[in-house]
Amino acid sequence: QNGRTTVFPEPSKNFMTGLGALPYALDTLRPLDAIIIMLGTNDLKEHTAQASVNGVGTLIRTIQTFDQLYPASVPLFGDNKPRILLLTPIEIGENVAEWDTLYGKGEESRKFPALMKGLCEWLDVEMMNTQEIVQPSKVDGIHMMPEEHRKLALAVRDRLLGLVKA
């Protein structure tokens, strides 16, 4: 779903947070082999990259403690081996329209890889720096063009296969 934040509700869409959707999605989809998280860009509309990464940390800790928070006959991860892959948000380009709430947030978006690396080391989860793999569209500076989606999908596939086989 486009427009989702990590944990910060937007006044016009207070239901569009990752934290709000996560418990229902996890409980409905269990058991899982792995979980991929890629959130953060929309947080920059009103918050810093550090605040966004703190929100991602809340999501990861929710996943890591899900079975204790919401016990069920089927564990969240079928083999009780949590596999979480965090993808950094892509860089926000320089050609974002002045009217867009993400205008001028490129520098802040480039902080995600270093901040998320520290978080992932602390919480013992895998990370992939998408900013080394794909570029934002020249059209809006925020989204990816189809060829960039393909590059990212192939990179995630390879990383995920290695993670699940481990």
Model regions and ranges:
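Histidine-centered active-site loop/cap adjacent to the catalytic His
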Residues: 126, 137-166
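Hydrophobic/aromatic beta-strand patches that form the interior of the parallel beta-sheet core
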Residues: 36, 85-87, 126-128
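Conserved SGNH/GDSL esterase-like catalytic core that processes O-acyl groups on lipids
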Residues: 1-72, 77-78, 83, 107-114, ...
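Alpha-helical structural signal in soluble globular domains
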Residues: 58, 62-66, 115-123, 155, ...
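Substrate-gating cap/lid alpha-helix
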Residues: 70-71, 92-130
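Short acidic/His/Gly/Ser-rich catalytic and metal-binding motifs that mark active-site loops
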Residues: 2-4, 93-97, 135-138
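Short, well-ordered beta-to-alpha junction loops that form the rim of enzyme active sites
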Residues: 39-40, 88-90, 131-132
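Extended, charge-rich low-complexity interaction segments
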Residues: 26-30, 116-120, 161-164
